[in-house]
Each structure stands twice: as C-alpha cells, then as structure tokens.
C-alpha cells in the first residue's frame, strides 16, 4: 500500500458526509451488516459517532484513548450506525474480523490470518504491513491485539494494512479460495467404531488467492502454524486415511483445481487442509492405546505418517519454546541430522544443536557407551560411588527395591526417546566394552514429564560433589545395579551435600583413553531456585545423557509425589539393609531414569511421575557370596515417558526398543542361562575382573564388587576366561571401523570366552567360522529388517513369557552376544522394498562392512560366488556419516558391490502366505510396483540375457512356451503365479514371473535381468536327488513375461502334508524326511549356496511310496528379483525361521549356519506338525529371537536325541551349531535305530 492510498483513505474518512451520505468511498459501511469494511470500527457505546478530526497522516496525531477503548473492549450491544445498519456486532468482534482473527477464541499468535475477505464483495482487503505479524507473535490473546499493534509509529491505515481495491472488488471474490485449515491435532481412531477422526488442535477458515504460489502458501502456513512440516488436504467425502499431500507447485495447483471442481458442483462443503508438525505425529503415536489391537495401531501409525522410533520424527520445531535459554530442552531434539554427536570416534568434536537457524552449543557432556556384557561392567561402574550414596539415604526413604538388574549384557535400553526428542548416540566403543544387548544408539537418561519440566539433579560420586542434570554430568553406568528409592525434594541436591560448579565437575570427569569427548558448558543457562548453585534448565519430554566410560555414578531424584508403593517389594533380606555399602545393589537411583535394564512399566499410578521399576524382580548378587542367588530371567528397559496421565498409561504397553521389554516377566526370580558368563566367572573374586586402565578409573579397584547372575549352562560349551587377560583396551577394539561404523570387539562382545583357548574370540570372527561367508548386503533389502523392527518396537508383548528354561537346553534363555548395531537400519527411503516369503535377498541393503580400508567396488549385475575359504573379493565398504534415524545415527552412502553366495533353486510350489497385519505399514512405505509403462522395453530387458555378462548361458535350457501346458494353479503372490503343468508330457511346476519384478529405471531393469539370468544359470547346474531340479527358463511367455520350469512334487510342501489329517507320519518317516532335507542342504552348502529361507513350506515331498517318503529342498533360487515385488506377505511367514544374526545387526557377514538355525525350527515342525509361534505377533517373534528368549516349546514326548539336535541347531551362537554334514549323520543314525526298533516287533510277531 503506497503513501497516496493511505492519504486518500484517511482523507475520505474525515469528510463531513462520511457517516450519512452515500459517497463513492471504498470504505463505505456495509449496508448488509455482514461485515464492516469501514476503516474505523463502529461505535459501541450507543451514542452518535462523531467525526474524528484529530488523526491525520500528515500530522501524525492519534485517536483518543476513549476512542480505542470503546472499540476494543466489547461492553454493550451494538446499536445501529448512522446508515441504519442494525446488524453490527460489538467493536471487539468487528476488529477481530477486520484483522482476520478467527472467532474460535484461540490465543495462538499464528491465528492472525494474512487475508480477510469481505463477503459482499465491496472491497478486497489485504494485509501488507509486516509489523502485524511481528507484533502478533507477542500477543497473548486477541483482546490485546489492537493495543499491541497501535504503536506510536503506526497509523490506522498501517495498522490493518488495507489497500483500496474498489476498482476490482467484483473480481476479488472469485480470485480467492476459502478452505478449512486444521493444525495442532492428531488423527486417531474413535473408541467404539474405530473410525478415524481429527482430535484436538484448532480449525480456522483461511482465505488464499487462487494464483498463490507454493512459496507464498508456505509462508502463510508458517504464519498460521510455525511448526508445520507436512501439509495435506482432505477432499469432501473422503476419509482421513485418504489425505493428499501438498509439497510442490504442482500439488498446489491440483488442490486448487479440486476446489474449482467442488465449487462448480455446488454445495457447502469446503476443502480441509491439515498442517502437521513432527511433534503432532509423535504425539499421535504416544496417544494410541496399543491395547486396542495391533492392526489399529498400525493403521494409525500409517495414517499419521509416523516412522515409529525414527529420529526423523524428532525435531526442534516441536518445542514449546525454542529460546536459547532452554538449552537442555533443545539438547534432546534432533532436526533432520543437524544434531551432531560429540566424540572423536564419529569425527565430531562437540555436541552442537541448531535452534531455529541459530547454532547453539550443548552445555552437556556428550558421551556415548554401548551396553557392556556381564563380564565387563567393572570397567564402567564407579568404584565407590554407590555405597556412599546408600549411606546418605534419608530414613524416610529407606526401602530398597531391587530392579531385576542382571549382568549388563542382559539389560535392554530404550531405543527411542519421545516425540520430538531424539538425542542420538554414536557407536562409540569403550575399551573392553561393546554392545551385547541393545540397539545403537542406546538411550539412557532422565525422563521428565512433558510440560512440567521438573529438574532432576545428578549425584556423581561419594564426595558430595554433585551436579545438576543440565550440567556436565557423570554417567550412570549402563551396567550399574541399582535399587530404587524416592522421597527427595525436586530440584535440590542429595541430602547433606552441596552442589559443585559445572567446571569443577567437568575437571573431575575421567573419560576412557579412546573416547575423548569435548565438554562445552554454558553455566549461564543453569539456575537453581533458592540458591546460587547451578541447576538444569527446563527440560521438555526427556533429558538424555550419553554414557561414556566415566567413573562416577549419577543418581537422579524424583519429587515427593512419587509413590513408594509403586515400587516392587524386595524379596532379598539383604536388600533391606545398609550393612554392605560396598556393593552395587546399594546404589540408589530414583526418578524416571530407565537405566541399567530397569523396566519402567508403570501400570497404575495416581501421579504423573512414574518411578522406574520392573515387573520382574531380581535379587542382586555380589561376589562376596560363594553361591550367587538366583536372579530373574531377563530384564529389559524400555523408555516410558509420562506425559499426560492418560497418555502415560497408554504408553506403558509399548516399547521403543524391539529388543526391550518384549518378554518382561512378572514371575519370581529364575535361572537365566548366559552364554558368556560361565560358571567359573561367578565364583571368581572381583580382583580378576578389574580394569587395568587406571587412567579411565580414578577409584580404587578394591571397592568393586562385581555382580553376576547364576548361570545355568553346561560346562562343556560355556567356559570362561578372566577378563584381566585383556589389558590394553585398544587390543579389544582392533576391528574398529573408521568414521564410527561398527566398532567390533569389546571385552564384552565375546562370542566365546574359552578357557582352553586362552584368548578371546571376537564376535565378528566367531560368527564367521563356517565354511561359507555371506555378506548380508546381498540378501536383505534395505528396509526389510529395519521396517519390521520399526514396527516391532511398538508391539505390546509384555504378556509374552520367555521360553521356559528346563535345564536341558543350552540355548534356552541365553544371552545373545551379537552387537545390536542398528546403523544399517537408517535411511530407508531409497528402495522401499519389503521381503515376502523371504529368500532373504539384500543386494541393496548397504549394511556396514567391517573393513577399515576405504574404496568402493563396482556393483556387478550378479554377485560372484565366494571361494571355499569363505572370503569375498567384493566386500562393500560403506562410509558412514551421522544420520537422523534413532536406530544408530549413521546413514550410509552408497556402498560398492557385495560379495555373496550364488543363490540356488527356486521352489516352484511356493505357498503364498500373505500377512495382513504387515500390509498396512508396507502400503504406506511404498506403492506396489506398477506394471511397466513401456511394455516392449520391459519385455526386451527381461526376456534377453544382458550383453557382456560374465555368465555362460549356453548351458541354460530355454523352454518354448508352446511346449508347456498349464493344468491348475498351485499358488500366487506378488512374485508370480505357480502352476502344475506339463512339459512335453512330463509333470512340471511352472512359475510365471510378473513383469513388475523387472520394473524400474533402465539401470535397475538391467541389473534385475542380469540377476535373474545369472541365478537361473547357477540353478541349472545344481543336481541332487534331494534338491528340486531346475529345468529351464521360458522367455516367450504371455505378454513377454518370463517363467521358470522346475520339477513337480506330487504332494506339494511338507507343511501341507503335516497339517493334513489323513496323512500320518510315524517317527521313522519323519526322520527320513528330515534326513533328506539335511542331505539336500549339505549339497547346497557344498556348492557355496545358502538357502536363507529354509522351512517346511519350502520342503517338497512325494509320499507315493508308503514305505519311503521323498523330500527335496526347494524355493531357494531367483531370490534377487523377488526384492522388487515381495511386499506385505512373507515377513510374518518367515521370521520364526530366521537366525538371530540375521536380525540383530551384529555384522554384515553371516555364515551358512543361518540355515542350520532354520533347520532346527524345521525339526520342531516335523516333530509337532504345528507352525512355530502361530499365535504371536511378528514383533514379539523378532524380539524373542534377537534376545534369544524365544524358541518353540518342545513337547514332552520328544526323545532326547531329537531334542538335543534341535537345540544345538537353534543355538544362538552360530559356531555352536552343527554343520549339515554332522546333522545328516546323526539323523542317519537315529533313522537306522528307529528302523531296527520297528523291525524287531514285526519279526517277533512273525515268529509267533
């Protein structure tokens, strides 16, 4: 609006005939009374409006105070104006309408609309004065708007920023669009009918120009709701699960076209636009009651666009306040990778945050430590911090509640924090420690209620040198064994102590030699009420502490409102005494601190503060007792963040860690078998377990009492070696990967601690002791594992109990020793492929390799087979950078080609088992592959082998389609359809492969085509009586599709036979079938071929001979092309057979022993005829397998030989599993014994 218009506007308003005469002025009062376009608000005091001549643009004079007060504060009913309009509202409401403020009574500054439309079309008013938004952000409520906006430098014209548009008044109405705009709420199912509806938030009607650009709309949206990250709109008549995203000019034009079409059709409905922030999505996740059912939960997750547990959902934009003073509040946020992690191991010097575009330096020490195994937590536990804290416990809080703390490797840590808070931890390796359980990054920390922002001080050591939580804090060791205690006043130091300054405390921090963390402190941000000591700033949602190998123990406190009765009672009489101040169980931790494996499942609480405790109680054991007492089974710690009480209770049934709280039991303490902490370790004195690194531990070792669980493991498999054999921490980390990738061998990362060998075998090395070395990169699609984990971490499996430990099985309830490095479950947006019926293929998964040397090897159309020594020449070496995902904060660049094992034969009678529960998530991850647009191009690529390929296709038989006859369909899926047919009179299985398997960019098409022909060529060379024969390829199928022709097995899959009531298989036949399968797998492994999907569905049988059934291995080839189309179906149908090392991310390499694990489950299937874990959700299955707390229940009628073989096959440690050669030999012996036993009674009857 230029100056001339201002002058014209106010000159007209001051003319004598302004009130009663009809003059051609743009701001003539609206005769309809619907809205006033007059510049001056009407008089509401009932008196005649006098012409005001004391305001002028030229003179700068202002209106009188009475004039403004009468028009701002609605006191009386409006009276007719001079023109006889009886419909005027009060001056307050008039002003609200003029400046575009909604009538909803919102106090949000962003309610101020940028446009206001006069319904009668007499004027087109636009706000152009930027000061309105500037002042608007400072408003607390609408009533103060005029006062805030009327500064001494503002004229009335400038105040509202209107321009004269009378010349185009008629066109201005049609050039505007009114749409509903909702923000601040979330989409949730309505209780009862589960119909989705938008809950909470605000809804306004906004007006935008039809020619508005996307950038202008974005600016307007940010003025309305500055936290907006996602814009979607809803077409009238559509449900909330059909929202349309707007992210570009084209999307905006489409939305406006939809508006035009709707306007042409008539009706009163309006387009509705939704503005979502990241915190909105996360709040929706927290608000979902998982008890309502998995499918409903998945649905809500998908509709809200939530990436469960993902750091992508965490943002600084979700903060209630983003001021620099609330630094701790910002500390736990992560804005799309801006939040960097301090630590040399990831190449970052300090923890820094970006707050609304301004860089802030974290005042907190950024430390990171992976969970350590049970044999090594003396490295990380403060030596004399615990007992001194216990001595200072006030009498009012003398109860000690054991928290089921098992040795460190049994502890689980929350994988995700809260919506909008995701402090990410690098994969730092502490000397002699590594992850045995838990996902990188692990979240430990001090959980503070959202909105209430309580302060929880930490108490680092015994010398009364305490630090508030916002300062550079000491860590609570992950392996610390603590009991709970409450009752300290919030915000104050431990009784009898005086806080120490941040700088002084920082000087006392001792960090291990290989983890130099830079500390950056901002004391000015910390104020302690009532004293001059520093205290933490306000914390939103969660205060997270990285835990490096620091030698102090931090103890948080909870407010007095935390009820002591919510804590589990102690069952160990020793727990209720303070006589043993030197033991770790005397350490006290209170508050919402889900540390050291504490499961904070608060099911009933009248307080918003949730004390951290576990459903399962453990009696902590120290080595002063010759025979350790029994500890509970496994204790997992999942993050529970109390927000509002209802959301807290809803949250309790969920875990943000697929490895945590999946199987928390509420039973009395029981034995826990652990692989690494052998019986010898329990009885050893703590001097054997002390750390030699005195620089990292300034306390004396004599104060340490190491706590171990009782181990129920057989002596021959679990032998232990004292940890003092490893002296130099660097010796334990020699496999460290540059740039913070998978650091390998901590002392606790032991696959075997074998006393006979007198050295430590690292996990990476131990897991690769098979004949074949497979790079998982070649088998799993990138987001196959990561997405099922992101779904599984939210599953409600608290009612699932671990497989009972009956003392006979080594593999029951043993801890898994693989590192839970989830760095490769990071950037999931590239391929978006999910495996079904997974012949697990992952050429594009880019799982981090363990090579230190850089470089990328070119990706081949088909990966080369491995040599017999199991060493691939094409290992990928992805370089890792800090990422955004909570799963490990590492995003991988494109890796090179990967070495793999040539896959073999594809089963032709595939049994299609579509998983409905997985479909909702998958469909929101990617759209199903559509049919190729250019069918000629696609057909040419698919039907012809690639030129210049390294494979020789001359030996591959090409079968003409006209020679085939399809008889009946056996099954179908996203991969294709299988038919029973005839090939020149012989029974065959024909698998028609969909063209969508080869869809994609030209380079992708070429790669997939090469993979198909390369695998087909290999399959044609596999010949064994217990392997399904591969006959050839059909390249001239209908529409140019490809097909494979394989041997047909009359009775189909073994699973089908087992469930048939008319088929009875005695023990001898079952042994024969198992033996045949073992022979077939032995042959495949001899050809460097790993199946990856061995199960009864993929074992084909022929039972025509009643005395000798025949079993053949199938469905293990052509796996790569499945990756593009295998969605939603096979995850649930394949997980029970997957080995832990395939799921836990411990290494990018696995051995052929993954098939041995699957075979153990197959033996159980053959024995029972049932499907493993039939009634369990796949999330529970994942957690159980990875934690090694879940195996099929062995029936009582199982004989010892079969039981032992099964348990050895599904042992957690790949090295402990037998080879198929050994398995086949043992089954042969068992079969011979069964045959002789069966023949003896027959001979006896014949002699009679």
From Swiss-Prot:
It catalyses: L-seryl-[protein] + ATP = O-phospho-L-seryl-[protein] + ADP + H(+); L-threonyl-[protein] + ATP = O-phospho-L-threonyl-[protein] + ADP + H(+). Hyperphosphorylated in response to auxin in an ABP1- and TMK1-dependent manner. GO terms for molecular function: ATP binding; protein serine/threonine kinase activity; protein serine/threonine/tyrosine kinase activity. Coiled coil: none annotated. Residues 1-49, 475-540, 555-585, 601-635, 659-684, 845-866 are annotated as: Disordered. The modification Phosphothreonine is found at residue 1125. Keywords: ATP-binding, Auxin signaling pathway, Cytoplasm, Kinase, Nucleotide-binding, Phosphoprotein, Serine/threonine-protein kinase, Transferase. Gene3D superfamilies: Phosphatidylinositol 3-kinase Catalytic Subunit, Chain A, domain 1, Phosphorylase Kinase, domain 1, Transferase(Phosphotransferase) domain 1. GO terms for cellular component: cytoplasm. Its EC number is 2.7.11.1. Residues 507-530, 845-856 have a biased composition (Basic and acidic residues). Residues 964-1229 form the Protein kinase domain. It comes from the Eukaryota. It is found in: Cytoplasm. Belongs to the protein kinase superfamily. Ser/Thr protein kinase family. This is RAF-like serine/threonine-protein kinase 20.
